Swiss-Prot record:
Subcellular location, record wording: Cytoplasm; Cell membrane
Claim: Phosphoprotein is one of the keywords in the record: no
Keyword terms of this UniProt record: Cell membrane, Cytoplasm, Developmental protein, Membrane
Function as written in the Swiss-Prot or TrEMBL entry: Required for the cellularization of the syncytial blastoderm embryo. Involved in the localization of the actin filaments just prior to and during plasma membrane invagination. Sry-alpha together with nullo and bnk may provide auxiliary functions, by acting both to stabilize a large and dynamic microfilament structure and regulate its functions.
Primary gene name: Sry-alpha
Lineage of the species this protein comes from: Eukaryota, Metazoa, Ecdysozoa, Arthropoda, Hexapoda
One GO molecular-function entry: beta-catenin binding
InterPro entries: Serendipity_A
Pfam families from the UniProt entry: Serendipity_A (PF05482)
A single GO cellular-component term on record: catenin complex
GO biological process, one term: cell migration
Protein name: Serendipity locus protein alpha
Keyword Repeat carried by entry: no
């Protein structure tokens, strides 16, 4: 521990030198070498100082924070390297840019020191995670495990012992449900208007069922208690199922908003009123991205994926406070604005890529088909802009299948042919809805064809998935009731875990989903830094 803290202290001293003119590429290499030594030693000792608590269903929050900080330091090193190179080429200093990334590195180093100290204390005191440290999915599992244990005990106990069973679990189950509702309401705050009310009502139902279950703890009728337990379980699954659907709705809307309103628009806003609306829309979308990321972390089973999503969210959160002023004053500080905009686009690209990896393809298609069916049903009453929006949402599916891991689900010949048909009809729909002379009948006809092709594509994915499941069938470790109800989860849990085991570098190189017209972003992503930066990325791979 002392050796680790000593290396971090040296890192802090080097960070202080980075803001001055002496902070050139040699200084950055010195910092990278020191941090590399620290990361190598930490990687060797982390299993000793950071035990897991498997009974709680997750890793320790301090360990996850250390992983996040390591990834953030590497990200900021890459951006500092780019900043120094731009300064050298233009012979013009960018102190604000340096300070932005140095402050982030400094915060991460200080946070690593704090987390290492916390891990040392936890190990000495045998502490465990609190409910505040659990994700939505982990809390759901805890609540369902409590109910499952209650049901099993209920079947094997006498009425006189029933009161003791409930008193033992009552306080913790109620607290778990309260934390589940907090997560759900935090998401509801940024959800689409159509989903906010439903989520709020489902939260109220869950709280009501939980209160009934706990208030009747003195009830000695096992049959009555079982019905109350089943009602609470149904309320939990009802909230989880709808939250999944609302999350997919939000992902469609959020990605379309990113395409329609790129951050670069803030550079050339024509007037203050238009700028104010752009900033408001930008802030709303950033809040939505944060909540999408939080739930993506909850559903992901791979710690590498969790860490990279957290890193993207951390980068976007730190940029949120400074990128708008930087773009609005880009005439005075062009390099500062360019570097921050590049960094923002890069992080958004990685984030979108990871979200598409986590989402189950069939669930995404199902969600879009529901929205498309509603759009077709109300086609006559809806304005042309709504038709354009639903077709643009179809482009999210096009983006989804650009990833090799998702395209591989179309391995059957029919799947690839239907994917080609989908791309063709989607482009036709976009042309029709974009035309000022588009007739409602023509629009509806194209949308119906799009629906038909996507429904067939979904069937092809199902058929391919069933073939793989039949060839590798195994006996599950959960009850049949739990297995059936867990099928409502629409994200990573429904995907093969083997598809997730890919390194950080490979995710950023081979699985991009940029707009084909936007070559600048894809080129910048594939840019390699110096050898030290590459070695850091390699050594910080999380096992």
């Amino acid at each position: 521990m002392e050796s680790l803290l000593r290396q971090l202290s040296i890192c802090n001293e080097l960070i202080a030198q980075g803001s001055c003119t002496a902070g050139h590429i040699d200084w950055l290499n010195d910092f990278c070498a020191t941090f590399l030594d620290f990361a190598s030693e930490l990687k060797a000792h982390l299993p000793e100082v950071a035990p897991r608590w498997p009974a709680e269903g997750g890793t320790n929050i301090d360990v996850e924070t250390i992983f996040l900080c390591l990834t953030q330091v590497v990200t900021c090193i890459t951006q500092l390297e780019r900043t120094i190179n731009i300064e050298g080429a233009s012979a013009r200093a960018t102190p604000m840019t340096r300070l932005h990334f140095l402050d982030r590195i400094d915060w991460c180093v200080r946070r690593i020191i704090f987390c290492l100290s916390q891990l040392h204390l936890q190990r000495a005191n045998d502490q465990s995670n609190s409910l505040e440290d659990h994700t939505f999915v982990e809390l759901m599992d805890l609540a369902l495990d409590h109910l499952e244990a209650f049901m099993e005990t209920l079947a094997n106990t006498t009425p006189t012992n029933l009161l003791c069973i409930v008193e033992e679990n009552e306080l913790q189950l109620g607290s778990i449900v309260n934390h589940i509702v907090r997560h759900a309401l935090a998401f509801a705050n940024v959800a689409l208007e159509a989903d906010k009310k439903a989520l709020s009502e489902l939260c109220e139902t869950l709280l009501s069922e939980c209160a009934t279950f706990l208030e009747d703890s003195g009830e000695l009728n096992p049959g009555h208690r079982k019905l109350e337990g089943l009602s609470l379980e149904r309320a939990l699954y009802g909230l989880e199922t709808y939250l999944n659907e609302a999350l997919l709705h939000l992902i469609f809307a959020c990605i379309v908003e990113l395409e329609n309103t790129p951050i670069s628009k803030l550079r050339h806003a024509p007037d203050s009123e238009f700028t104010e609306q752009l900033v408001l829309d930008f802030d709303t979308n950033m809040d939505r991205i944060q909540q999408i990321g939080v739930l993506a972390i909850a559903f992901s089973q791979d710690i590498k994926t969790k860490t990279i999503v957290r890193s993207c969210l951390a980068s976007l959160e730190s940029l949120d406070a400074c990128i708008v002023p930087a773009l609005q004053s880009s005439a005075l500080h062009p390099h500062h604005a360019d570097i921050l905009e590049h960094h923002f686009n890069e992080e958004i690209l990685i984030f979108r890529n990871l979200i598409h990896e986590i989402i189950d393809s069939r669930s995404l298609i199902n969600n879009y088909l529901d929205m498309l069916a509603e759009s077709i049903h109300l086609a006559v009453k809806r304005p042309p802009r709504d038709h354009l929006l639903i077709v643009q949402m179809g482009s999210v599916l096009e983006e989804h299948f650009r990833l090799p891991v998702n395209y591989s689900e179309l391995s059957q010949l029919d799947g690839k042919r239907l994917h080609t048909d989908f791309m063709l009809i989607l482009s036709e729909c976009l042309a029709v809805v974009s035309s000022p002379l588009g007739e409602p009948k023509r629009i509806v006809k194209r949308l119906k064809i799009l629906y038909s092709v996507l429904a067939k594509l979904r069937h092809a994915i199902d058929r391919n998935k069933y073939v793989h499941e039949d060839s590798s069938a195994s006996v599950p470790n959960v009850s049949s009731r739990r297995q059936f109800t867990n099928a409502t989860r629409t994200l990573l849990r429904m995907k093969s875990k083997s598809k997730r085991q890919r390194s950080f570098v490979r995710q950023r190189r081979d699985c991009l989903v940029p707009n084909p017209q936007n070559c600048s972003i894809s080129n910048s992503i594939s840019h390699q830094g110096d050898l030290i930066s590459f070695q850091l990325t390699e050594i910080l791979r999380i096992n």
